[in-house]
Amino acid sequence: MPLYEHVMIARQDLSNSQAEGLIEHFGAVLSDNGGKLVDQEYWGVKTMAYKINKNRKGHYAFLRSDAPSSAVQEMERLMRLHDDVMRVLTIKVEEHAEGPSVQMQKRDERDNRRERR
């Protein structure tokens, strides 16, 4: 089956548990249609470069999946219809990268910096 990576932005007024619940919900949609969610990362609330639907911030989530194209199309369709999801980006990849995504690596590197004066 083809491999995909998805980035989803949800509304800023959701709680963290609600945003993570969306990830679980769309992972279940994939598995119901014959695919599987390989990995998921919740990146937290981030400021966007421009407003989307009058929102300056959003909950970012990253999903890696191994699913047939019909399952991915159904998941994207449901994401676009869902009121809490503002944007979705899906790309097809040859292979999934090992370890955490670049966003999560940056967060880890920030912890190693010395304190400001």
Swiss-Prot record:
Residues 105-117 have a biased composition (Basic and acidic residues). One of its GO terms (cellular component) is cytosolic small ribosomal subunit. GO terms for molecular function: small ribosomal subunit rRNA binding; structural constituent of ribosome. Residues 96-117 are annotated as: Disordered. The keyword Membrane does not apply. Binds together with bS18 to 16S ribosomal RNA. This is Small ribosomal subunit protein bS6. It comes from Ruegeria sp. (strain TM1040). The gene is rpsF.
